[in-house]
Each structure stands twice: as C-alpha cells, then as structure tokens.
Amino acid sequence: MGTEQTVRSFSRHAAAGAVSIIEGNRGLFDGVNAAGEFSTGELAKLLNAPVILVVDCDKVTRTAAAMVLGCRNLDPQLNIRGVILSRVSGSRHATVIRQAIEEYAGLPVLGTVPRMTDLPFTQRHLGLIPPPEHDAAQHALDRAGMIAEDCLDIPNLLAVGESAAPWSVDAFPNPEQDERGNEPITIGVIKDSAFQFYYSENLEALSDRGAKIVEISALAEKSLPDVDALYIGGGFPETQAGRLAENASFRLSLKAAAERGLPIYAECGGFIYLGESLTIGDAHYPMSGALPVSFSMEHRPQGHGYITLEVDRQNPFFPVGTKVTGHEFHYCRVLTLHESESFTACRVLRGTGMDGKREGLCRYNIFAGFTHLHALGAAGWAQAIIGKARQHRAERQSKIISPSLRKRDAGGF
C-alpha cells in the first residue's frame, strides 16, 4: 500500500495507546529491491519513528558494534536510539559487547536477552503457533513478560517511544468510510483455529462500508448461516484437516451455498478449504468441494514473498486490467485441477500463485487463490465484495417475492 494508506492505518490504530511498538520485518534495510524500498527503515522514516536495533549476538563480540555502526552510517536519516542484545551467553559476553557498541557506535544498550533453550513460544512450518491453537498461550505471554521485565530497560525504552512526535488521528481521514448503502448486508467471516489470518484493515474496510461482520466456525457449526457474502481468510487447515473433514454437514452446506451463487472471496487456507481434498503424507482429507481442485501439503514452501497479479479474465470481484499486489506463504501446492469446470482470472507477474503462471481460481461467484491482499493496497476490493453481496441479497429477495406476485397476477387479489 502507498504512503497515504500506511500513515492512515498507523494513525487509526495508534490512537488508543500512548506508545506504539512496531515490529520490524527482516533486517532494518531489507525491502523489495537493493534500494530498500518498503523496508523497516523506510517505514521508520515515513512515520518519524525512533528505531531500537535488536542485534543477534550469538558467537560475536566486537563485531556487533560494527553491525550497529554500519546501520547508523548506511542511512544517517534514521533516528536509531538504542540497541537490545539478543542471545547473549553470559554477563561477561554482554559486558564486552555493551562496551564496544557504546564506544564505537555511540548508542546505549537498552536490554540484554540471554540465549534460551526453553523458549516460551513454540514454532512450526509457518512460524509461531498462533494463540487459538496454543494451549498455554497466556502462560507463554506471562513468561515473555517476566523475561522482558528482567532483561530490558523498560523506562528508557518507553522514553524513546514517548520522544516521537505525536500523530493526529485525522491526518488522513478515510475518504471511503461513509460509502454505505441504505440496506445493511451481512458478510460471513470463517474464523476459528483453522482460519485465523485476517488483516484487521480488511475487516474494517468491509464494516466501514456498512457490512455487518458475522464470525463463523467451520469446525463447530453444523451449517453455514444465512449471509450475503463470505470471506474465508488464511490459516492452518492442514493442522485441523481431520476436524474440518469430520464436519461434513458444514462442508456440504458451504458447497450448496456456493452453487446457489453466494459471493465468496477466499485466501490461501480458505482456497484450500474450498477445494475437493487435501493430502498430507499418506492421509487424504475431503474439503468442501466447491472448487474442482485438490491440494498436497509439501515439506518446503511452495510460494513465499510478495506477489503481483494482472487480472486478464472477467471474475466476480476485480475488473480486467487491474494489478493486484499481495503476499503469499504456503506449503501447499495444487495437485489436480479440472479446468473445464473453472478458470483462473489472473496472470502472475511476480511470485508463484497456483503454478508460477496463473492465480485466482473462479467458479460460480467464487474468487480464490494463495494471495493475501491488504484492503488499503487494493483499491476497490471492499467495494466489490459489498456490491456483490448487495446484488446477491437482491436476487434472493426477488426469488422470495416473485411467487406471491405470480399468485396475485393470477387473480388472487
């Protein structure tokens, strides 16, 4: 998303707190190209945010100072205010690194975190296990809090945050916030342990335009409730494949709704669930069957990073010619695809998508793929879902009304 959208998002979400902590992605200068565009460093400059470097100190001492000094000198416009040392082996190790950084890089060390073998947060193929699947999530957070309290100079870290210039929440008001229809519509969002990855701005973009968001569980509910459109985000259907397969009544109701023309937008995990089956090793799990495609879970990522698409076929949500940018990270690949019963709407310009060439599988009123998009960087996405939902609602209402009209026209009144 662009500069204005980024600032608007930050302003909106930072309004409730005195200090906002922004977690950097990858290294400070790592972006989409050699110039570091869209990097953490560029974001820090855009938001006028002070930077705290977290330095991996495993098996290094004075070299840590060279890394910190290099970060300071590579872009002097960055406001780097301090350093946190990570994976330190002991007090002597920490003292040597601290002295080197303070002498050669001229920055204070605001925390020293020791190397830990029993980390409170467990991981798997796509990163940390998310709270809905973590039996001891609160315990892990409590332990992480104690580690932070023991190892970080929290008063000085907060002082760095408080030194940043204040933001006006209305600096970039959302120009689309009042684009609402007169009649409310309902958009279902499948949200449970299997489907849990949603950008908050995506849901806000829908509710800002008048949609009522209804959360649905594909694991616990017996059937899909009455909604005007459905949004199925990413998640981990592979870890819940058995439970998803066992809930046959929900799977069948979802397929039936798709066949009746329910507008459905699905990303990654949602795409997999709309398919016919998911193969994990020697096990095969039936999915909803709304799309004529099957998937296989692999041991290595099949797509990871930014993705750019060009829409070249008519579909339920994007005009032909639209450029769609997003992110993909999936271990699943398409195993079989019956192209005679469906079609792909997008050409892959960058990234992998379904096969390195095509993305966005369509059937009925479904658009599904591995791409995660962000509403603030996808102009028209929310409006398109709202529009399709209103259209579907009107079509259903006309079918309900038409029998009584036919009866009256036949002489009933």
Where are these regions (language model features)?
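ATP-dependent carboxylate-amine ligase catalytic core
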Residues: 1-47, 55-82, 91-95
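Cysteine-nucleophile active-site neighborhood
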Residues: 213, 237-317
